[in-house]
Amino acid sequence: MGVVGWHSVRVPGGLTDAAVELAREVAISLKRHGATQVYLIKVGDDTLRFLDFWPDRASYDRFVVIAEAAMSQDVPMHWDLMHGEYVSGGDGNADILLSLI
């Protein structure tokens, strides 16, 4: 069994090019740190959602460290990191607008 995470990121003032670029960098970093798949979903004018899949709980837990580091960047983002559960696979029902990896 793996872990799927879904993480909302609200950017005060809207999704600027800088905010989207930072989100891309975070997604690529997640992939480097063990995520098997990472998707970025636009939700409204000021919110992005990461949908990420991990092979095990230990690799998923490292996500929090990566996200906290990203929050110290120049672009202010409010992260909701409290989601994650063991699953056998994704349900495929998300409206995925942009596949990053």
Predicted regions and their residues:
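Short, surface-exposed ligand-recognition loops at beta-strand->loop->(often short) alpha-helix junctions
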Residues: 9-21
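An amphipathic, aromatic/His-enriched active-site/gating alpha helix that lines ligand/cofactor pockets
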Residues: 25-37, 53-90, 101
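Topology signature of small-to-medium multi-pass alpha-helical membrane proteins
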Residues: 2, 98-101
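Short hydrophobic/aromatic beta-strand micro-patches
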Residues: 10, 51-53
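Active-site-flanking beta-strand signature of metal-NTP-handling nucleotidyl enzymes
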Residues: 2-10
